[in-house]
């Protein structure tokens, strides 16, 4: 069996490719079923965020397993394999384990140390378990990866003051507005007419960061107006006007800065919509939705400047040098956890031999116990029988303790193979299997 991961991220593919591979929550179950339908795939889990789509699998064969996942991704995205393959990354075995742990720790994020990815890995684990697409191997890997992410954040300073995609989006707005005014610094957003489209978690984070950067009023547009109103109630110090999506156009026309973060699978704003507004003021769009909420053609409008998640790199690079130094410490913790998982996984090779040995000894114990009890006659009480049975079980467990501990202990694969062969030969385990 082999652990593999196939996917795309902000490192390997632009947003126009990533958005076609994005798997929304309502499609996860169907996608997991499609992947499990491949005979090579034994366990599978999906991580889908604005910056990455990664499929982790336990496969019978690493090469055919990877090929199956690539086939699924090509069919799902509608991108022909020859165009998609250059954007895909593949990791096998130890590298796949290391990659997931680094992702969970925030070491592979656009924003080093960002905390949201950890909750997304937790969600991936939960969805895999709910859909019964994961088993003992991936469940163990996911659990340990989540623990690794927590450990990195608690034992290093990587997560201290870490920016997120949302905060980077706000900083990008500050930077671009400042540059228009001739500054290379982050300026206050106090004078901007701000519109936020969407009322999910990312929008909540956007509003939090907007408030900290001088914004004291904004318009919040969402398809479900009640959800927008509930979100607004969490910010009593801000003047938030809530509107339905049917009022989007008129609110764009009175805004100078628009943030979009919705779960829409198609753009909700395009050039045709903007041209109908007869804009006479400069307008900035910052779109952190994946798939994108804003069509790329809006950039053709003379009064519009539009940015997406790939443009956040300009802001992120300003803050990365300090975090790169802290990341070295975090990477050593991740490596320790990787070794622990791999040692556990390697020890599973001994399980069939251990189970066979235990089964054979248990059969002998029962046979010999029955012989002894039959000799004791009817005067031997039920309580005494229980005592003798407990005694025989204790003897078997004592006999098994040392060899089982040795077989499960950390050692190279070659050393474990030698140990397994010795045990099989001493107790004739392999010969019994052949005879059966």
Curated annotation (Swiss-Prot):
The name this protein carries in UniProt is: Glutamyl-tRNA reductase
Record GO terms (molecular function): glutamyl-tRNA reductase activity; NADP binding
Q: InterPro entries this protein is in?
A: 4pyrrol_synth_GluRdtase (IPR000343), 4pyrrol_synth_GluRdtase_dimer (IPR015896), 4pyrrol_synth_GluRdtase_N (IPR015895), GluRdtase_CS (IPR018214), GluRdtase_dimer_dom_sf (IPR036453), GluRdtase_N_sf (IPR036343), NAD(P)-bd_dom_sf (IPR036291), Shikm_DH/Glu-tRNA_Rdtase (IPR006151)
Is Aminoacyl-tRNA synthetase among the key words of this record?
A: no
Its annotated function is as follows: Catalyzes the NADPH-dependent reduction of glutamyl-tRNA(Glu) to glutamate 1-semialdehyde (GSA).
The record's comment on protein family reads:
Belongs to the glutamyl-tRNA reductase family.
- Site for Important for activity, residues: 99
**Gene3D superfamilies attached here?**
Glutamyl-tRNA reductase, N-terminal domain, NAD(P)-binding Rossmann-like Domain
Q: What is its EC number?
A: 1.2.1.70
Task: Alphabetically list the UniProt keywords.
Answer: Chlorophyll biosynthesis, NADP, Oxidoreductase, Porphyrin biosynthesis
Q: Which residues does the record give as substrate binding sites?
A: 49-52, 109, 114-116, 120
Query: Does the UniProt entry include the keyword Cell membrane?
Result: no
Q: What Pfam families would the database entry show? A: GlutR_dimer, GlutR_N, Shikimate_DH
Q: Name one GO biological process term.
A: chlorophyll biosynthetic process
Q: Source gene?
A: hemA
Quoted from the entry, the domain comment is: Possesses an unusual extended V-shaped dimeric structure with each monomer consisting of three distinct domains arranged along a curved 'spinal' alpha-helix. The N-terminal catalytic domain specifically recognizes the glutamate moiety of the substrate. The second domain is the NADPH-binding domain, and the third C-terminal domain is responsible for dimerization.
User: Per UniProt, where does NADP(+) bind?
Assistant: 198-203
- Any remaining note in the record? During catalysis, the active site Cys acts as a nucleophile attacking the alpha-carbonyl group of tRNA-bound glutamate with the formation of a thioester intermediate between enzyme and glutamate, and the concomitant release of tRNA(Glu). The thioester intermediate is finally reduced by direct hydride transfer from NADPH, to form the product GSA.
């Amino acid at each position: 069996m082999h652990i593999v991961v196939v996917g795309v991220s902000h490192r390997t593919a632009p947003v126009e490719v990533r958005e076609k591979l994005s798997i929304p929550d309502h499609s996860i179950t169907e996608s997991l079923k499609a992947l499990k339908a491949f005979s090579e795939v034994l366990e599978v889990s999906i991580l889908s965020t604005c910056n990455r789509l990664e499929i982790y699998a336990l496969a019978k064969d690493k090469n055919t397993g990877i090929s199956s996942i690539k086939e699924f991704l090509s069919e799902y995205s509608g991108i022909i394999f020859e165009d998609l393959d250059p954007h895909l990354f593949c990791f096998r075995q130890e590298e796949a384990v290391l990659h997931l742990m680094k992702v969970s720790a925030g070491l592979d994020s656009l924003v080093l140390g960002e905390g949201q990815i950890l909750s997304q890995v937790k969600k991936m684990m939960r969805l895999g378990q709910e859909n019964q697409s994961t088993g003992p191997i991936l469940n163990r890997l996911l659990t340990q990866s989540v623990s690794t992410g927590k450990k990195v954040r608690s034992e290093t300073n990587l997560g201290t003051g870490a920016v997120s995609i949302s905060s980077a989006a706000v900083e990008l707005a500050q930077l671009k507005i400042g540059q228009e005014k001739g500054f290379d610094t982050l300026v206050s957003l106090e004078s901007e007419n701000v519109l936020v489209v969407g009322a999910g978690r990312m929008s909540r984070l956007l509003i939090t960061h907007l408030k900290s950067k001088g914004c004291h009023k904004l318009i919040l547009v969402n398809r479900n107006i009640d959800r927008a109103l509930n979100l607004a109630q969490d910010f009593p110090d801000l003047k938030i006007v809530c509107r339905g999506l049917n009022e989007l156009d008129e609110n764009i026309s009175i805004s100078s800065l628009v943030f979009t973060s919705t779960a829409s699978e198609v753009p909700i704003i395009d050039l045709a919509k903007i041209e109908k507004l007869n804009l006479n003021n400069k307008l900035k769009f910052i779109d952190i939705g994946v798939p994108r909420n804003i069509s790329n053609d809006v950039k053709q409008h003379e009064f519009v400047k539009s940015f997406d998640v790939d443009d956040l790199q300009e802001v992120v690079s300003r803050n990365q040098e300090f975090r790169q130094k802290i990341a070295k410490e975090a990477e050593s913790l991740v490596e320790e956890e990787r070794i622990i998982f791999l040692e556990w996984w390697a020890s599973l090779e001994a399980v069939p031999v251990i189970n066979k040995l235990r089964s054979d000894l248990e059969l002998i114990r029962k046979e010999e116990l029955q012989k002894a009890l039959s000799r004791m006659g009817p005067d031997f009480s039920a309580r005494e029988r229980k005592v003798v049975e407990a005694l025989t079980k204790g003897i078997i467990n004592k006999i098994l303790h040392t060899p089982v501990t040795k077989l499960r202990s950390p050692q190279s694969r070659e050393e474990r193979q030698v140990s397994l062969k010795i045990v099989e030969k001493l107790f004739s385990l392999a010969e019994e299997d052949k005879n059966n």
